[in-house]
Amino acid sequence: MKPSERRKARRLAVQAIYSWQLSGNNIADVEHEFLTEQDVAGVDIAYFRELLGGVATKKSQLDELITPFVTRPLDEVDPVEKAIVRIATYELTFRKDVPYKVAINEAIELAKAFGAEDGHKFVNGILDKLVARNK
């Protein structure tokens, strides 16, 4: 498994979680849709599935971890940035094999690619505070 395969899995997971958040569709249906309708060449499919399923099943727990560091209600946070923060929080909490610097850097890069103009600063701020609290 190459790092680029995980990066592609994260990119696809952001898009899938964004879709799930907005549509309210069953996560299994969202997963199936993305795996059949998107280009998944070079994607770590197992990691994509873990991120998608993990964020969906642990959403409440992840949101409880995130909420203290957000200055507005979570439902007012940009859905792309919320998806990115949820993925990174999942990695920071449940994937101890992923160094926290990697999880944060990947989230920042995803926010630069998909988020609002200063979305990466928002994402970085939340994740830095989350890591500092959990050290």
From Swiss-Prot:
CDD domains linked to this entry: Terminator_NusB
Q: Which Pfam families match?
A: NusB (PF01029)
Its keywords, alphabetically, are: RNA-binding, Transcription, Transcription antitermination, Transcription regulation
Could you tell me the Gene Ontology terms of the biological process aspect for this record? DNA-templated transcription termination; transcription antitermination
Q: Which InterPro entries match?
A: NusB-like_sf, NusB_fam, NusB_RsmB_TIM44
Indicate the family of this protein: Belongs to the NusB family.
Protein name listed in UniProt: Transcription antitermination protein NusB
Q: Which species expresses this protein natively?
A: Shewanella pealeana (strain ATCC 700345 / ANG-SQ1)
